[in-house]
């Protein structure tokens, strides 16, 4: 069935056989693997000192070539109205830090077109995140569809660019970026409303939320104290040392604060229980 020109969807613009061919190109095991390894789709990308600038295309180079060939063959015989366009409604990036909040550094994230040698942000859609701002969600919306063409030796498509700045003294991973998007391909294109890049700061996960009640906190402290006493003072098949027991009992008895530097103060410091989880 020849191109009808009545729909923007690829399925209605070409025969069922050719749309099936395109599905095989996009969702073959090899294509899915390439999307993960070359584009980091849905995977965590680590920002390190030796990888301060990351450019990740939204379509693998091999897949890009096959899709472009598919559209070109349909265009040459008159079945398709163009050589193909790539459309990405939205790119969503989840950014988390992997160092303490006092580390001085930032990330600059933006969407670029590989057809641009300068890799400038598309329509100024660029977000800067300081380390203490993280975690955060970042979103981009391209304002046009990208032609499936080759410019010089570059396969033209959209790409996510991440730049790491600062973090002096931190050579390892300082932030993790997980990007998700859904690329679409059609023989017709469009322009879209300009929407500024979105930046939503996210509250860090409170893993102690279930232990905010006093009873839960008391149970946690009691279990920690019991563990310490057991590990230090319970001896198998032996009589408990009287001195050790008396010092153990001091943990549960409130006493006036001792003078700094006194022997009692140093002894209480030595047997002060370790409290976990910031409690």
From Swiss-Prot:
Any one Gene Ontology BP term: transport of virus in host, cell to cell
Domain of life: Viruses
Entry keyword annotation includes Secreted: no
GO CC terms of this entry: host cell plasmodesma
This protein's UniProt keywords: Host cell junction, Transport, Viral movement protein
Biased composition annotated in UniProt, kind: Low complexity: 254-268
Disordered: annotated span: 246-279
Chief location bin: host cell
Family: Belongs to the cucumovirus movement protein family.
Name of the protein in its database record: Movement protein
Organism of provenance: Cucumber mosaic virus (strain N) (CMV)
